[in-house]
């Protein structure tokens, strides 16, 4: 299996993890406030990533300082902004609405790359975007027009749209940032920075006292 096929195979796992985050987050939010939950999630991920970075000897202080503006931006959009709106949105809308909105992200990322980064456009790309959007709608609604027509939009949906915008901005700028910093070091630094911002905001939720009582069992 060549490198390109391996990358495509790895990309197939992305929507799997995205989908799983909705179900787990919905359960977690019944016991822990949203920003506190996001802080724990990325705090744990950040610790693991720091260990991996040092294991692979990829730490480079000079590169981090040189690219700090880009790293700060992807941290604020991809970790902080996206997850604040994502977790808060789950408090006000259904996972169906949320997943439908977020699932359109690849379409808007592709359009943004074509419009702002001059990536090539072709009929094949256009058809792929249309088919992927139709596929998302069909899968989530189980092919029922009644389900699609009965969707109503509320405060939670607007929060998910804000999360979508953050995700698109992160995806478009992340590629540029990684030209100067390795993907692993970029992911580690943005996760750690994002966790710091989330932790600061979580203090206003007063939810850390509930963490010790968190249960993994269904209520």
Model-derived segments and spans:
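Glycine-/small-residue-enriched transmembrane alpha-helix faces in small-molecule transporters
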Residues: 1-39, 149-176, 196-200
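Loop-to-transmembrane-helix transition segments
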Residues: 6-16, 60-85, 155-163, 210-219
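Specific transmembrane alpha-helical segments of multi-pass solute transporters/efflux pumps
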Residues: 17, 21-22, 50-102, 138
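Small-residue-rich packing faces within the transmembrane alpha-helices of Major Facilitator Superfamily
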Residues: 19, 43-47, 133, 168, ...
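Membrane-interface helix termini and inter-helical loops of multi-pass transporters
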Residues: 23-34, 59-61, 88-91, 140-153, ...
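Specific alpha-helical transmembrane segments that line the substrate/conduction pathway
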Residues: 36-47, 77, 86-129
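Hydrophobic transmembrane alpha-helices of multi-pass small-molecule transport proteins
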Residues: 49, 112, 121-143, 191, ...
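Cytoplasmic-side transmembrane-helix entry/capping segments in multi-pass membrane proteins
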Residues: 66-74, 121-134, 181-190
């Amino acid at each position: 299996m060549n490198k390109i096929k391996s990358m495509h195979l790895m990309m197939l796992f992305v929507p799997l993890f995205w989908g799983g985050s909705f179900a787990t987050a919905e359960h977690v939010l019944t016991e822990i406030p949203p920003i506190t939950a996001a802080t724990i999630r990325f705090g744990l991920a950040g610790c693991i990533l720091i260990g991996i970075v040092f294991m692979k000897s990829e730490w480079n202080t000079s590169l981090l300082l040189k690219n700090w503006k880009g790293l700060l931006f992807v941290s604020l959009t991809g970790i902080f902004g996206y997850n604040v709106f994502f977790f808060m949105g789950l408090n006000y809308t259904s996972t169906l609405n949320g997943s439908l909105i977020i699932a359109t992200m690849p379409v808007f990322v592709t359009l943004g790359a074509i419009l702002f980064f001059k990536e090539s456009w072709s009929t094949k790309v256009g058809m792929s975007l249309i088919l992927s959007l139709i596929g998302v709608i069909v899968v989530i609604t189980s092919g029922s027009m009644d389900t699609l027509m009965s969707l109503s939009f509320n405060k939670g949906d607007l929060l998910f749209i804000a999360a979508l915008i953050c995700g698109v901005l992160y995806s478009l700028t992340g590629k540029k940032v990684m030209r100067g910093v390795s993907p692993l070091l970029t992911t580690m630094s943005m996760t750690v920075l994002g966790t710091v911002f989330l932790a600061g905001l979580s203090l206003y939720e007063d939810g850390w006292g509930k963490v010790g009582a968190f249960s993994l069992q269904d209520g």
